[in-house]
């Protein structure tokens, strides 16, 4: 058989991000069979145990490369890490939905939350040479504490101007189709980089901009021509 695109054993070599959907399917099955039947107290206990397990996995660097970006290939570490990475925030989200009480004052929640996420996403890899992974500490803290607080704060706010409302609606609509269609175009971009040996921003920004623009346009077309019509048809069954 021909070698996969990047040659690193991806679970879904033609569209890498599908690995997370694989675990989401498992999460939905577990929810239907078990989690939805749990009391809020038992759900809290389960969520706490999963948070502890995820922290252990991240801080002790079980992945071997100081990150919990795991689940994308089929081996023991990635299956375990992928399950923890999915079940921990999944159960936390269900618990939050049961206990959610919006903040009274959450003005500018959209812009504040967006700015906070932008800052977090620009934090570089935190190197450490000890027994514990500092980058794992940071990632676990984001998953267990920071991101849930951002979701809570953002969900407490309401967009009051036309621009914010349109931006939020567009980002919400486009997020799923963009996630699932962008990677094949990124593969093409990678192959272009390797073939042309152009690596600097000055050399690559036109191709990078074209790849991003094509991904957004393709996602929008999938949303309008496939996703929305299929959802409408399913609702009418």
Where in the sequence are the language-model features?
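Acidic active-site catalytic centers that drive phospho-/nucleotidyl reactions
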Residues: 24, 182, 227
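Intrinsically disordered, low-complexity segments enriched in small/polar residues
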Residues: 23, 174-177, 224
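Alpha-helical transmembrane segments in multi-pass integral membrane proteins
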Residues: 5-8, 34-38, 69-216, 232-237
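Primarily interfacial, aromatic-capped hydrophobic alpha-helices that serve as membrane anchors
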Residues: 58-75, 218-224, 228
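Hydrophobic alpha-helical segments with transmembrane-like composition
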Residues: 1-58, 218, 222
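Aromatic-anchored segments of alpha-helical transmembrane domains
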Residues: 1-2, 49-63, 115-127
């Amino acid at each position: 058989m021909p070698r996969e695109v990047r040659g690193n054993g991806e679970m879904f070599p033609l569209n890498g991000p599908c690995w997370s959907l694989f675990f989401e399917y498992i999460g939905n099955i577990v929810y239907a069979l078990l989690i939805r039947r749990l009391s809020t107290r038992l759900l809290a206990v389960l969520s706490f145990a999963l948070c502890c397990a995820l922290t252990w996995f991240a801080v002790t660097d079980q992945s071997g490369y100081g990150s919990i970006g795991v689940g994308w290939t089929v081996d023991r570490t990635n299956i375990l890490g992928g399950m923890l990475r999915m079940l921990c925030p999944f159960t936390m989200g269900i618990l939050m939905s049961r206990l959610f009480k919006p903040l009274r004052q959450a003005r500018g929640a959209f812009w504040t939350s967006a700015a906070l996420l932008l800052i977090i996403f620009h934090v570089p890899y935190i190197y450490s040479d000890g027994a514990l992974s500092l980058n794992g500490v940071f990632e676990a803290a984001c998953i267990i504490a920071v991101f849930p607080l951002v979701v809570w704060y953002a969900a407490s706010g309401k967009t009051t101007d036309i621009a914010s409302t349109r931006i939020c609606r567009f980002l919400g609509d486009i997020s799923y189709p963009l996630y699932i269609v962008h990677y094949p175009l990124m593969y093409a971009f990678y192959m272009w980089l390797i073939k042309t040996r152009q690596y600097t921003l000055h050399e690559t920004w036109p191709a990078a901009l074209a790849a991003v623009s094509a991904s957004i346009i393709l996602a929008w077309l999938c949303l309008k021509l496939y996703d929305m019509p299929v959802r409408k048809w399913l609702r009418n069954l």
